[in-house]
C-alpha cells in the first residue's frame, strides 16, 4: 500500500504556504463506509477501467470528463491490471493524504485488480488530475520495473535509481514522503509521461515535483530514454524541454532580493510559463514556499523576495527556484541557494544544482 501525503495550496504572490509533512491519523467515517457501499455513479471507459464516484452532485458527464483527462496520461499494457478508480469527497486518512494506489503481489508479480483512491474530490479541488496522474505513475512503474527488472519493492536496486542518482542522497527513504524513492519515481512519470493538460493547474507550474531539492525529471540525462526503453512507450508528443535560462541575483537592498533572467526558447514556439518560488525548511516537519511575482521588460524578466517577510519568518537560508515550463508540461529549472546572512555573496553567481536544506 503506497500513499501520497501532500497538501497542495494555491496562494497569491508573496504569500507563505505551509506544507505540513506526515500523515494524520484522523479517519472519516463516511469515506470508510463508502468502501463497503455501492458507489453513487459509475462509468467504464475505453480501457476497461471503471470510475466509481461517491461524490454527491457528480453526474455522468463529470465522470466522463475525469476519465478523458486520465486517458491523456501515457498508458500501455499495464492498464489491464487496473480495475477501477474511486472518487471520495472527504479525507479518511487526513487532509495530507490525497490519493493512494493499492498494490498487491502474487508469486512476485503484480496482481490484477489494482485500484486507485482519490480523496477530497470536488469542484473546488483543482489537484485531482495531478493526483490521479501521480497515483497511476505508481501503477505504471511497479508493473514495468517488475516485468523488466524483477523489482517488487526496493526501487534502489533498479536501473532507474542509478540514472536518477538516488544513491547520492543520504535522505532517500528516510521516512520523509518527498524523499521516498517510489514517490520520486511517480513524480517523474507525471513530468515525463503525464497529461500535458496538467499545465492548467497553477500549483503544478511552480511545483512540478514534490521534492524541490532534486533536479526535475527533464534535467536528468538519460531519464526519459530510460522510461521509453522500460515501457516501450514514447510519452507525450512534445518530447523536448525548454532551454534553461540563467537566473541571476542582481540587487540586494534592506527591503528585498532582486532577480532577473532573459527570455528563453522552446522548440514548439508556444509561450512558456515562468514561475519563481523560494523554498526553505524552517523545521523538520514543514516547508515554506514563497510565490514570487514576475514582471517583464522587453526580453528580460524580473522577480523579487521581501527581506522583511523573510526576517519575520526567521528564515536563515533559502533556495530560490526559477521554473520554466512549456505548454506540454515539460519543465526545467535554475536554482540559487542563498545564505541570508550574506546575500551579497551571490551576485551574478552561476546557479548551482539543487541542494537539500536542513
Identify the residue ranges that each predicted region occupies.
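Metalloprotease/metallohydrolase-associated module, dominated by Zn2+-dependent proteases
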Residues: 159-246
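Solvent-exposed loop/turn segments flanking beta-strands in beta-repeat/beta-sandwich domains
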Residues: 264-289, 315
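Sec-dependent signal peptide cleavage junction
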Residues: 20-34
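Active-site scaffold of zinc-dependent metalloenzymes
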Residues: 93-129, 142-143, 262
